[in-house]
Amino acid sequence: MAELTIDQALQQGVEAHKAGQAQEADRLYTAILKAQPKHPDANHNMGVLAVGVGKVETALPFFKTALEANPKVAQFWLSYIDTLIKLGKLADGKAVLDQAKSKG
């Protein structure tokens, strides 16, 4: 089998994720991040995957990196703020919300 492009790996990762195949999605997202550590969608999806398997704390750096790479995606802000709230970091969540508002 030929090597996948980043876009193909991301698409397959999303499909695996939606199908409940967390290990396969993790493998694909990890491969993308090895090639492009700041890839915004792969970072965001790794964060979503981590939250989905109960590793909420693990999700934070992925969401933060996704936001730093592409702060224009509203879902990245929502995921990051939601995770901070789930961890009881309300002050941090409010600060990030204020930051999101200032970025439009």
Spans of features found by a protein language model:
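Register position in tetratricopeptide repeats
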Residues: 18-19, 52-53, 86
